[in-house]
């Protein structure tokens, strides 16, 4: 979970580290407290221009399909990633992979933008080098199509067309939410279609973000999980989809916002 309080402390810690290690070469940055968790790091990276420039390996390779360019530091524009939004999204093929979130042993993570209408993916490659996360490359490429109903294409339709959405929500829809009488337990129940439309979150239609901690995102997977995570506001919704007779359907909805 992205922690705003922790992030502010981390920014202060970074400035402290900067003053201690003035003799360090820029290409060998010192780790800060936020580097322990990639989620904490990426919030700091996107929020703090000074840190961002320290953590981009310039000249930065930028691949657009088969074309490669190098971005020099003087041409770098601060990238807010998803921090200007109220939430970001994560994609998984199976529930077990959600345990990778918060894993402090990771050394390679990719942040992805999936552009729904243009079917393009922009991927940022981060490596942890001597304890410090570094952006090493950016890659922009088309999303491949296959003969099955493509999840990104399906979700773009699902998010924007309520009639289509109503045809692709299983009834009854499994629903998991926080017990109002006990914050430490959850209620498992079901929703009908009208209740889904009353409880559902606003769905991202233009683009999806994803942080690839090492989970598989296989186009042929029969299941997909889309997690919507709030940035500093306790919002947490998870949508569970499966492919049935070749078509995607929403079969479970989880709202454990605090």
Predicted regions and their residues:
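Surface-exposed beta-loop interaction hotspot
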Residues: 130-168, 172-187
């Amino acid at each position: 979970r992205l922690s705003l309080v922790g992030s502010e402390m981390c920014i202060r810690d970074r400035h402290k580290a900067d003053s201690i290690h003035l003799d360090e070469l820029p290409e060998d940055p010192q780790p800060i407290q936020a580097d322990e968790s990639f989620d904490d790091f990426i919030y700091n990276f996107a929020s703090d221009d000074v840190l961002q420039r320290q953590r981009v390996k310039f000249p930065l390779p930028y691949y657009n399909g088969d074309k490669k360019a190098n971005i020099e530091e003087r041409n770098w524009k601060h990238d807010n990633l998803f921090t200007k939004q109220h939430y970001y999204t994560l994609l998984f093929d199976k529930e077990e992979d959600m345990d990778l979130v918060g894993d402090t042993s990771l050394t390679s993570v990719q942040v992805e933008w999936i552009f729904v209408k243009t079917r393009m993916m922009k991927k940022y490659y981060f490596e942890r080098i001597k304890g410090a996360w570094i952006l090493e490359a950016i890659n922009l490429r088309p999303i491949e199509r296959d003969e099955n109903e493509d999840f990104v294409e399906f979700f773009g339709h699902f998010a924007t067309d309520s009639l289509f959405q109503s045809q692709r929500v299983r009834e009854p829809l499994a629903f998991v939410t926080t017990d109002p009488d006990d914050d430490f337990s959850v209620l498992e129940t079901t929703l009908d279609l009208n209740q889904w439309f009353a409880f559902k979150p606003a769905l991202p239609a233009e683009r999806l973000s994803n942080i690839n901690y090492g989970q598989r995102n296989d186009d042929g997977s029969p299941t997909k999980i889309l997690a919507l995570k709030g940035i500093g506001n306790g919002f947490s919704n998870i949508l569970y989809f499966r492919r049935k007779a070749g078509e995607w359907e929403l079969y479970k909805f989880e709202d454990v916002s605090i």
